Amino acid sequence: MKNAIVKFSLTALAAFTLAACGSSGGSSDNTAAPSNEQKTQATPSKTNLPTQNSTKANQNQTFTGSAFVISEQDDKVQVKNVKFNNANINQLEVDGQTITLTYPGIYAGSWQRINNTAVCCGKYANVRMGVSLSKGPTEKDILFYNGAPTQNMPVTGLASYKGDSIILSDDIGDDSDEVVGQSSFDVNFGAKTLSGSITANNVPTINISANISGNSFEGTAKSTKLTDGAVEGKFYGNNALELGGLAKANDNSWGAGFVGKKQ
């Protein structure tokens, strides 16, 4: 996966868009948007659901997001999971590295690419997901998600989420080893279960199955052609309006990030 992410800096990042907001101007980095970019923002459900007491929901849910810090040693991919405890969607501190997620006067509703960092997406109010790429083979790549976790989790009812994803793998079988795509999830708050998928062009679908605990979820990530793995994530915003997370193969051969919004 390390080789895939290093290659990512030279290929897929060119597909991300950067939009300028207002009279402050934009960046000369602007490129064509991915064909799978979602053009509209879904309207959240207006159903009023019972909610968990915020203290109970967060007894052991103190982290706000996490990152995979990816390096290569002796031709083996090494992945370290780093937890965040700061609900900052503008900047992250990861393994001694500062990652800027937003810039004054610049807005990108879809993927935003500045320098070696790609972030998704301005259309989400409470969560960000993306990748910060190394500038050379001796540096580390960082795949991350973070945001403002839900304090009032629903305890009954069903919800569906749709959003964005990125998949990085040596086994995609395309000209590049990475691709942006979509995410789709169904949640049963009463049963505390989440199921869904991460999809992208030319990539075997990654099926997600997880159990919910508080405002977090953990489970499995499986595909017909990719190695099985694990998934983690959290719900963000009022009444679990949005979600985000990461998935990774058990043998580190692929990794993925995803975000979604309640429909």
Regions found by a protein language model. Give the residues of each.
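Bacterial N-terminal signal peptides that target proteins for export
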Residues: 1-9
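Generic detector of short alpha-helix boundary/capping microenvironments
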Residues: 9-10, 221
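Mature soluble binding/inhibitory domains
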Residues: 22-263
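C-terminal motif of bacterial Sec signal peptides marking the signal peptidase cleavage site
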Residues: 18-20
